Amino acid sequence: MLPFASCLPGSLLLWAFLLLLLGAASPQDPEEPDSYTECTDGYEWDADSQHCRDVNECLTIPEACKGEMKCINHYGGYLCLPRSAAVISDLHGEGPPPPAAHAQQPNPCPQGYEPDEQESCVDVDECTQALHDCRPSQDCHNLPGSYQCTCPDGYRKIGPECVDIDECRYRYCQHRCVNLPGSFRCQCEPGFQLGPNNRSCVDVNECDMGAPCEQRCFNSYGTFLCRCNQGYELHRDGFSCSDIDECGYSSYLCQYRCVNEPGRFSCHCPQGYQLLATRLCQDIDECETGAHQCSEAQTCVNFHGGYRCVDTNRCVEPYVQVSDNRCLCPASNPLCREQPSSIVHRYMSITSERSVPADVFQIQATSVYPGAYNAFQIRSGNTQGDFYIRQINNVSAMLVLARPVTGPREYVLDLEMVTMNSLMSYRASSVLRLTVFVGAYTF
């Protein structure tokens, strides 16, 4: 009730009430319609025409299109197109009719909410209903009564856009880094693999993973090495092994014969010799070891590489045996007058190609008589002059090898010692019959 109504007469009070009702029913300002109306997105209510009219977003939205894009208005919305794009307008100039306005009750819910069938206010998911203004490069996250535009993992916001972060600039990877849209990938150098954190690199044990080494494999940091067993050498490919021909490298590995075998070599000696740990060949003394076939009536004589069975009694008429190696010609026998009084049998062995001159045997007088003079000579068996006698003193002399000789060969030298005494007009001789065996080898 108006505050001054009580001062008016009754008829005037009635007219004032009617005028008040008429004023309330008259058209209001177009911006404030007498009924609540709602237009769809992209349209607004035109109070004059009582219709929804298109909103020109290109004029109403500041910087509707960014960068080099141009804004093209169309019914119910707008487009952002490149400036070089051609736009063909409707030839008849008729656009789609504006959607009809429909009356509805005002939204009783706060912004970002809408009523459901039970008239409860529920959150509007702007992200799923495309009611957001997030850029294509951004992610829309719905919030209670609102939404939020964020950059995906691996991106950062520069201006209005989300730009990929080059994680490789921050050296996250131990070896190599490959940048990817929104992410990155670490790679390792050959010989390494990614660790559990996918960033650091750990050494790969190629030997446990089937490295192509033929014989032996040694793992090292970031790689592996192939090695060969003793007696083999690594091939140029770095993986396979080939046998070393040790015998072809040197002729001094073995004294006699070198035989190459896979991964090794062996030394061999000729028959009659045994191999020593030093790879030298040593003569086997068959007479000492009993590995001979001499009878009881024979004597075993060993020489380099073999042995000889000789008769125990080697005395020939008119000589008689007085000991195992000595034959005596009796003075009572007339046949002994022109013969040496005794013959002593000796045996020795020398190697082939011995350096010369070489002292090989010393002759020694067993009896010394006062006033006697002894002379030594080679009586027989030195037809080629391979030996000569060098007298040392009155009672001894040395048999000398004058030239290198090659075996197998055998010499029987009669070394004579002539004893003379001018005062007594005495002359006698004795012979040392020396059998010299020359071995077939230089050892």
Curated annotation (Swiss-Prot):
The modification Pyrrolidone carboxylic acid is found at residue 28. Expressed in elastic fibers of the skin, near the dermal-epidermal junction, surrounding the hair follicles and throughout the dermis. Expressed in tendon around tenocytes. Prominently expressed in cartilage, bone, perichondrium and ligaments. Also detected in bone marrow stroma. Expressed in aorta, lung, and esophagus. GO terms for biological process: aorta development; aorta smooth muscle tissue morphogenesis; artery development; elastic fiber assembly; negative regulation of vascular associated smooth muscle cell proliferation; positive regulation of aortic smooth muscle cell differentiation; positive regulation of collagen fibril organization; positive regulation of smooth muscle cell-matrix adhesion. GO terms for cellular component: basement membrane; collagen-containing extracellular matrix; elastic fiber; extracellular matrix; extracellular space; microfibril. Residues 36-81, 123-163, 164-202, 203-242, 243-282, 283-328 form the EGF-like domain. It is found in: Secreted, Extracellular space, Extracellular matrix; Secreted, Extracellular space, Extracellular matrix, Basement membrane. InterPro entries: cEGF, EGF-like_Ca-bd_dom, EGF-like_CS, EGF-like_dom, EGF-type_Asp/Asn_hydroxyl_site, EGF_Ca-bd_CS, Fibulin_C, Growth_fac_rcpt_cys_sf. Keywords: Basement membrane, Calcium, Disulfide bond, EGF-like domain, Extracellular matrix, Glycoprotein, Pyrrolidone carboxylic acid, Repeat, Secreted, Signal. The record marks 87-88, 90-93 as: Cleavage. GO terms for molecular function: calcium ion binding; heparin binding; protein homodimerization activity. Residues 91-117 are annotated as: Disordered. Disulfide bonds join 58-121, 65-80, 71-109, 127-140, 134-149, 151-162, 168-177, 173-186, 188-201, 207-217, 213-226, 228-241, 247-258, 254-267, 269-281, 287-300, 294-309, 315-327. PROSITE patterns: ASX_HYDROXYL, EGF_2, EGF_3, EGF_CA. Pfam families: cEGF (PF12662), EGF_CA (PF07645), Fibulin_C (PF22914), hEGF (PF12661). Residues 1-27 form the signal peptide. N-glycosylated; contains mostly complex-type glycans. Not O-glycosylated. Cleaved by ELANE; produces a 50-55 kDa fragment. Cleaved by MMP2 and MMP9; produces several fragments. Glycans are attached at residues 198, 394. Disruption phenotype: Homozygous mice for the EFEMP2 gene appear to be outwardly normal. Homozygous mice exhibit severe lung and vascular defects including emphysema, artery tortuosity, irregularity, aneurysm, rupture, and resulting hemorrhages. Mice died perinatally. Mice with conditional knockout of EFEMP2, in vascular smooth muscle, grow normally, are fertile and exhibit an arterial stiffness. Mice with conditional knockout of EFEMP2, in endothelial cell (EC) are healthy with an normal aorta. Plays a crucial role in elastic fiber formation in tissue, and in the formation of ultrastructural connections between elastic laminae and smooth muscle cells in the aorta, therefore participates in terminal differentiation and maturation of smooth muscle cell (SMC) and in the mechanical properties and wall integrity maintenance of the aorta. In addition, is involved in the control of collagen fibril assembly in tissue throught proteolytic activation of LOX leading to cross- linking of collagen and elastin. Aneurysm may be prevent with postnatal administration of ACE inhibitor and/or angiotensin II receptor blocker (ARB). Homodimer; disulfide-linked. Multimer; allows heparin binding. Monomer. Binds preferentially to p53 mutants. Interacts with FBN1 (via N-terminal domain); this interaction inhibits EFEMP2 binding to LOX and ELN. Interacts with ELN with moderate affinity; this interaction regulates ELN self-assembly maturation stage. Interacts with PCOLCE. Interacts with collagen type IV trimer (COL4A1-COL4A1-COL4A2), NID2 and moderately with COL15A1-derived endostatin. Interacts with EMILIN1; this interaction promotes the incorporation of EFEMP2 into the extracellular matrix. Belongs to the fibulin family. This is EGF-containing fibulin-like extracellular matrix protein 2. It comes from Mus musculus (Mouse).
